[in-house]
């Protein structure tokens, strides 16, 4: 089985190709929109994705050394995400499905992150941290679905850090030589400032932390503010994670999503793993951020269980939660 996956939920237009036997991932091509200033504007995302989609599709097919006719199914991330960006991927998927008579497979973006994590880390039964620009979720698989034990009550961890570095003119670009701008700034910081620390059970709130940190700009050294906001945010996440570990008794902790690439977070998680006797499984950097390969792979799993959608019913779902998705391919 060969499945072509299309990702366009936010700043990345990605096309991946997966097959149902090793090495599983045959291609993982993408192009990421980087705004010259400010945040991501939906109209700019739509224009970018529409302009690069054809090129990325061709590159993926060339990388896999196959033609579109060799593909069995078309998988597409229908949500969650930014509406105009989602529509580009959905439109491309529908066009390919109709033109080449290929069945369409609906994929939840978060499930894509989680399933590529299972594949690349070889985790068996983990507690999962799904950390990205749009999501901060603590979950695990139980009785047919991924059940959420904790999540952000407002903005996501990744988004909070992106907004801060943008507001203080440290970004864009957000990632420099594999490091987030807040990590680079934090390297010269050492003073832990007083900032809000909000954990409610296994849920977290980052909006107050962001607001308070921005109010300190000009009053404290920027390096100390970066250091403090990062340390406090990560410690909040770790406290909520420890509670979930105590509740579930899991012996594996899998981290997926763009924030999984953070070296500083990795160090904290390794310490937590030693303390709790838990194996830490972190998705490789090339699959941490948004990508088409994860959509192709999750789509392959879904297709293997007959999960398809009619083209005329393939609506985008900007607020589609991972705990709303049935997972028939997992026992």
Swiss-Prot record:
Species this chain originates from: Saccharolobus islandicus (strain M.14.25 / Kamchatka #1) (Sulfolobus islandicus)
Q: Which reaction does it catalyse?
A: L-threonylcarbamoyladenylate + adenosine(37) in tRNA = N(6)-L-threonylcarbamoyladenosine(37) in tRNA + AMP + H(+)
Q: Keywords on this record?
A: Acyltransferase, Cytoplasm, Iron, Metal-binding, Transferase, tRNA processing
GO process terms (BP): tRNA threonylcarbamoyladenosine modification
Q: Where in the cell is it found?
A: Cytoplasm
Say yes or no: keyword Transferase present: yes
> Residues that bind substrate, according to the entry?
130-134, 162, 183, 262
Q: Does the keyword Metal-binding apply?
A: yes
Q: Would you indicate the residue range of the signal peptide? A: none
Q: Which PANTHER family match?
A: TRNA N6-ADENOSINE THREONYLCARBAMOYLTRANSFERASE (PTHR11735:SF14)
Task: Specify the protein name.
Answer: tRNA N6-adenosine threonylcarbamoyltransferase
Q: What is its EC number?
A: 2.3.1.234
Lineage here is:
Archaea, Thermoproteota, Thermoprotei, Sulfolobales, Sulfolobaceae
